[in-house]
Amino acid sequence: MAASAAALLLASAAPAHAYIGPGAGFAVFGSFLVMLVALFLGGFVLLTWPVRVLIRGHRRRRAYARSQTDRVVVIGLDGMDPDIAESMMAAGRMPHLSKLRDSGTYGRLETTCPPMSPVAWSSFMTGAGPGRHGIFDFLHRDPRTYLPNLSSAQIRPPARSLRVGRFRFLLGRPVLRALRRSKPFWAVLGEHGIFSTVLRVPITFPPEPFNGLLLAGMCVPDLRGTQGSFTFFTTADEAGARHIGGERVHLVRDRGVVRGELPGPAQSGLAGAPAARLPFLVRPGGNGTARLEVNGQRVILRQGEYSDWLPLSFWLGPGMRATGICRWYLKQLEPEIELYATPINIDPERPALPISHPRIYSVYLSKRLGRYATLGLAEDTWALNEGVLDEASFLRQCQLLFEERERMLLNAVGNTRRGCVVCVFDTTDRVQHMFWRYREHDHPANRGKESAAFGAAIEEAYEQANALVGRIASSLGSGDTLIVLSDHGFKSFRRGVNVNAWLKANGYLALRPGATGDGEWLRDVDWGRTRAYAIGLGGVYLNIRGREAQGIVPREEAPALKQELIERLTGLHDEEAGQAAVNRVFDSAAVSPGPYTDSGPDLAVGYAPGYRTSWDAAQGKVAGPVIEDNTRRWSGDHCVDPDCVPGVLFCNRHLDVASARMMDIAPTILSLFGVGTPAYMEGRSLLAPTGEAGYAHA
């Protein structure tokens, strides 16, 4: 789904050019020169310190001269649904959010089209729609190859390399490029002298420089270059067993110990780039414990508990290493040993790729608060979906990640006397995805599974979020602004729709002779006879001549074809369920106008609640039924008609929340600090004329 493992490894091997440089003499001379320059600069800094303090103070006073607030603290609760939130507030189960509602503002927040986290959070930060920030889905397609790419970032290897025997040395650094367009509001604030701390907001990788601190969120890859690949180890002989989202590795018993190898990133210094592997052994003990020995570390594992984050160093070639971190989870010791390792996260203390701005910020957080997850999608939903983790161990993982994020937020708020702090929490989203089936006894995902024990998981995640809001609110003063919001709501995901299967059945998509349609990423498609195809979680593209590599649809015929598809897909009937699977189909050019509209899907499918793109369709397969049951634990979703999944908006100030949209938040924050709205922003400020704060502090 994400950048390739090889490309990521190039980043971890970036210092390789130093090993074929001019030599040690240059390095020694350079060090002496650096020392002289450092002494000179140190004296200059000391002499000019009083003047710089006066100038900085003057600039700060000017920056806040028009501000209506000392601090703005934004808490993002990904996926918090207004129906559930309102029901729980009515029952008295979320008192802190109720207090915000009663003394300040509460309203439903219009999400984006489509209602996906990368799209919505991009609109949150830029104040613009997809046509202006260029993010339309988790995935975009490459019109040259028809293959999917990560929509938010591009990682390319260095242009030059040097091969010496079986080794390949990379000359230079990989190219990292953020694909989101338009400027985030914190960069605008920074240009006006207002400092921001931004924590784990989606679509902030790679970090862009601005006047502030940032730790990147969703779409940060793991050390293998994927969006999260777990490893499951077992002594059981399960030849041929495969997992989506992870790898199964056989453990070997050897005279009382168990040996295994943890697969890591590709060894980019070697021809053919095999994966680096880190050997380890497990010594079973008594009372449900075992000793893990890996990378020179000895750690006691307890059955049913996660280890701390362990640093791991992988040899990639001569002079090249990449450091990552992972947690280990001992599932069982008998009759077979089963051991789970989280995806190998980039080590925040020795990041193989830039994950923060400035780069030292990730190191500071780790030294100050302890090592933490850096993977964008840190909650391992695939491990639960595949049955590698059970519900209890997944929830424990979510709890650990929530606590890490909370420590970061409390640290940032405590260090910020004036300015903006933004932090997004993912737990509400991940728990609803994986536990929605417990709300519906007849959900197809409950077949053959226990369906009662975790019925309160979603409400407990909401209560946890409410408690967080209370802790942050109690730390704020009367001159501070607190905003709590979600990017979208949630609905059940009972049935999956394969739009490509429908396009094939209705003559818009054709397969190559002899192909079955089972191939992933549309590899079975005959592009010379295909007029439309679907990629991602709701996007439909026309195969336009001159835009796609093998396009056949003349541009002048595209509007008519779009309208034909809109009419035929709208109200698509689910024969088995006896209802419509599709509410509406949107013309992207109409709902998301802007300079980047043509790079996104031509149409966006707005599914009815209970439906979503099927799992096969999400992998680019054409074969199979048009509509089928969703039997996976991932049983809730939000990739539906955006009108069905608004988010929530709370604030301790009185805001004009009538028809409030996700893209209105950025202009609102700017106006709180007295900064005008840039022309590229489509949103409006929600500040009420009085602008009075109204939060009664705990």
Write out the residue ranges for each language-model feature:
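Active-site-proximal N-terminal segment of extracellular/periplasmic enzymes that hydrolyze or transfer
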Residues: 56-106, 115, 191, 195, ...
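Short, structured active-site-proximal loop/turn typified by the sulfatase FGly-forming signature C/S-X-P-X-R
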Residues: 85-135, 139, 197, 510-511
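His/Asp/Glu-rich, glycine-adjacent segments
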Residues: 128-449, 530-580, 614
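Polar, surface-exposed loop/tail segments
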Residues: 207-210, 492, 557, 562-564, ...
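Metal-dependent active-site segment of extracytoplasmic phospho-/sulfohydrolases and closely related
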Residues: 462-503, 580-588, 594-596, 604-606, ...
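Substrate-binding rim/cap in mid-to-C-terminal beta-strand-loop elements of soluble/periplasmic
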Residues: 503-555, 630-673
